[in-house]
Amino acid sequence: MSGFLDFKAVVEQEKLRPVRFTDTGRGRLGKLLKAAREIRGWSIIETEMVTKEYEAALFRTAGEPVPKDVGISNATVSRYERGKLESLDWRSLSLLCFVLKPIDPVTGQALEPTNALYIACEHPPYNDTKLYE
Protein backbone atom coordinates (compact mmCIF):
# COMPACT_ATOMS: atom_id res chain seq x y z
CA MET A 1 0.00 0.00 0.00
CA SER A 2 2.86 2.39 0.68
CA GLY A 3 3.97 2.06 -2.96
CA PHE A 4 0.58 3.32 -4.05
CA LEU A 5 0.78 6.29 -1.71
CA ASP A 6 4.29 7.14 -2.94
CA PHE A 7 3.06 7.03 -6.54
CA LYS A 8 0.14 9.30 -5.70
CA ALA A 9 2.48 11.83 -4.09
CA VAL A 10 4.66 11.86 -7.20
CA VAL A 11 1.66 12.38 -9.47
CA GLU A 12 0.41 15.29 -7.37
CA GLN A 13 3.82 16.98 -7.55
CA GLU A 14 4.07 16.81 -11.33
CA LYS A 15 3.34 20.00 -13.17
CA LEU A 16 1.50 19.91 -16.46
CA ARG A 17 3.18 21.88 -19.20
CA PRO A 18 1.13 23.77 -21.76
CA VAL A 19 1.21 22.40 -25.27
CA ARG A 20 2.58 24.82 -27.83
CA PHE A 21 1.05 24.65 -31.28
CA THR A 22 3.23 25.95 -34.07
CA ASP A 23 2.09 27.94 -37.09
CA THR A 24 3.52 25.23 -39.33
CA GLY A 25 1.79 22.47 -37.38
CA ARG A 26 -1.59 24.22 -37.39
CA GLY A 27 -1.19 24.87 -41.11
CA ARG A 28 -0.44 21.21 -41.81
CA LEU A 29 -3.42 20.08 -39.76
CA GLY A 30 -5.62 22.59 -41.58
CA LYS A 31 -4.53 21.28 -44.97
CA LEU A 32 -5.34 17.70 -43.91
CA LEU A 33 -8.80 18.74 -42.70
CA LYS A 34 -9.50 20.76 -45.85
CA ALA A 35 -8.38 17.91 -48.12
CA ALA A 36 -10.66 15.49 -46.24
CA ARG A 37 -13.60 17.89 -46.60
CA GLU A 38 -12.95 18.35 -50.30
CA ILE A 39 -12.65 14.58 -50.85
CA ARG A 40 -16.11 14.23 -49.32
CA GLY A 41 -17.35 16.97 -51.64
CA TRP A 42 -18.70 19.09 -48.79
CA SER A 43 -18.72 22.85 -48.51
CA ILE A 44 -17.75 24.46 -45.23
CA ILE A 45 -21.45 25.05 -44.51
CA GLU A 46 -22.26 21.38 -45.22
CA THR A 47 -19.47 20.40 -42.84
CA GLU A 48 -21.06 22.59 -40.16
CA MET A 49 -24.41 20.86 -40.68
CA VAL A 50 -22.89 17.36 -40.55
CA THR A 51 -21.06 18.13 -37.29
CA LYS A 52 -24.33 19.39 -35.79
CA GLU A 53 -26.19 16.25 -36.88
CA TYR A 54 -23.39 13.98 -35.64
CA GLU A 55 -23.14 15.57 -32.20
CA ALA A 56 -26.94 15.76 -31.81
CA ALA A 57 -27.14 12.03 -32.61
CA LEU A 58 -24.60 11.34 -29.84
CA PHE A 59 -26.80 13.13 -27.31
CA ARG A 60 -29.96 11.36 -28.53
CA THR A 61 -28.23 7.97 -28.36
CA ALA A 62 -27.21 8.70 -24.77
CA GLY A 63 -30.82 9.64 -23.98
CA GLU A 64 -29.85 13.21 -23.13
CA PRO A 65 -31.46 16.44 -24.32
CA VAL A 66 -29.70 18.00 -27.30
CA PRO A 67 -28.13 21.39 -26.43
CA LYS A 68 -28.63 24.27 -28.84
CA ASP A 69 -24.90 24.78 -29.43
CA VAL A 70 -24.02 21.39 -30.93
CA GLY A 71 -21.67 21.11 -33.88
CA ILE A 72 -19.02 23.44 -35.17
CA SER A 73 -19.75 26.77 -36.86
CA ASN A 74 -18.63 27.27 -40.44
CA ALA A 75 -16.38 30.10 -39.24
CA THR A 76 -14.58 27.69 -36.90
CA VAL A 77 -14.25 25.08 -39.64
CA SER A 78 -12.72 27.76 -41.87
CA ARG A 79 -10.28 28.87 -39.15
CA TYR A 80 -9.18 25.27 -38.59
CA GLU A 81 -8.56 24.83 -42.32
CA ARG A 82 -6.51 28.02 -42.51
CA GLY A 83 -4.54 27.10 -39.38
CA LYS A 84 -5.65 30.33 -37.74
CA LEU A 85 -6.90 29.05 -34.39
CA GLU A 86 -4.67 30.12 -31.52
CA SER A 87 -5.98 27.28 -29.39
CA LEU A 88 -7.45 24.00 -30.53
CA ASP A 89 -10.64 22.91 -28.84
CA TRP A 90 -10.68 19.16 -28.10
CA ARG A 91 -14.43 18.86 -28.74
CA SER A 92 -14.38 20.58 -32.12
CA LEU A 93 -11.17 18.89 -33.21
CA SER A 94 -12.60 15.49 -32.27
CA LEU A 95 -15.82 16.22 -34.15
CA LEU A 96 -13.90 17.22 -37.27
CA CYS A 97 -11.77 14.08 -37.09
CA PHE A 98 -14.78 11.79 -36.58
CA VAL A 99 -16.86 13.42 -39.32
CA LEU A 100 -14.25 14.19 -41.98
CA LYS A 101 -11.95 11.23 -41.30
CA PRO A 102 -8.74 12.86 -42.60
CA ILE A 103 -5.91 10.47 -43.38
CA ASP A 104 -3.14 10.20 -40.79
CA PRO A 105 0.14 10.83 -42.68
CA VAL A 106 2.02 8.34 -40.48
CA THR A 107 -0.42 5.42 -40.26
CA GLY A 108 -2.46 5.88 -43.44
CA GLN A 109 -5.62 5.31 -41.35
CA ALA A 110 -8.29 7.77 -40.21
CA LEU A 111 -6.66 10.52 -38.14
CA GLU A 112 -7.31 10.22 -34.41
CA PRO A 113 -7.82 13.50 -32.49
CA THR A 114 -4.74 12.84 -30.34
CA ASN A 115 -2.56 12.51 -33.42
CA ALA A 116 -4.12 15.70 -34.81
CA LEU A 117 -2.75 17.46 -31.74
CA TYR A 118 0.67 15.93 -32.43
CA ILE A 119 0.54 17.39 -35.93
CA ALA A 120 -0.41 20.83 -34.60
CA CYS A 121 2.54 20.93 -32.20
CA GLU A 122 4.97 19.18 -34.60
CA HIS A 123 5.60 16.30 -32.22
CA PRO A 124 7.67 13.38 -33.58
CA PRO A 125 6.99 11.51 -35.80
CA TYR A 126 4.59 14.13 -37.18
CA ASN A 127 7.34 16.75 -37.55
CA ASP A 128 8.88 15.11 -40.63
CA THR A 129 8.36 17.49 -43.57
CA LYS A 130 8.41 14.56 -46.02
CA LEU A 131 5.01 13.47 -44.70
CA TYR A 132 3.38 16.63 -46.03
CA GLU A 133 4.93 16.88 -49.50
Give, region by region, the residue ranges found by the protein language model.
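DNA major-groove recognition helix of helix-turn-helix/homeodomain DNA-binding modules
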Residues: 1-7, 89-117
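Short coil turns linking two alpha-helices in DNA-binding domains
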Residues: 43, 54, 73-76, 89, ...
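Short, basic-rich loop-to-helix N-cap that marks the start of a DNA-contacting helix
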Residues: 67-98
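Short, positively charged loop/turn segments that connect secondary-structure elements
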Residues: 53-75
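A short, Lys/Arg-rich alpha-helix, primarily the initiator
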Residues: 2-60
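Residues in the recognition helix of alpha-helical DNA-binding motifs
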Residues: 36, 50, 80, 119-120
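Short, charged recognition helix plus adjacent turn
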Residues: 8-15, 107-133
